[in-house]
């Protein structure tokens, strides 16, 4: 049996298809984060981008997400050094830190159901930015991601 590509290649060596398949579809990167201007510490909130579907954990307009006017960031191989803001469970961050994929990752299990069952997605756990007045009230204390 051959070694999976994520174990045999660096992030920079991956094809576009391999790179895209690393995304588990959890939706955590689509949650708004706050950053302390003095310490650069990142605080996660449960406030979702208005384009995020909280049931499917995917963008409502995925093909146009970078031109929609939202603050959607494209994760690219030339930005690996900036991945510290991503959730600790994120495959891009984990591989950039030489950590293995989590056991529930779809590349390991073959589907997203294990991720949802492990509580590692944002499915039905968010509020939308349009409904929030003070984002600081929505900071997640000790997020499990």
Curated annotation (Swiss-Prot):
Family annotation (Pfam families): CxxCxxCC
Domain of life where this protein originates: Bacteria
Segments crossing the lipid bilayer: none
InterPro entries: Puta_zinc/iron-chelating_dom (IPR005358), UCP006173 (IPR008228)
Family indicated by similarity: Belongs to the UPF0260 family.
Name of this protein: UPF0260 protein VV2402
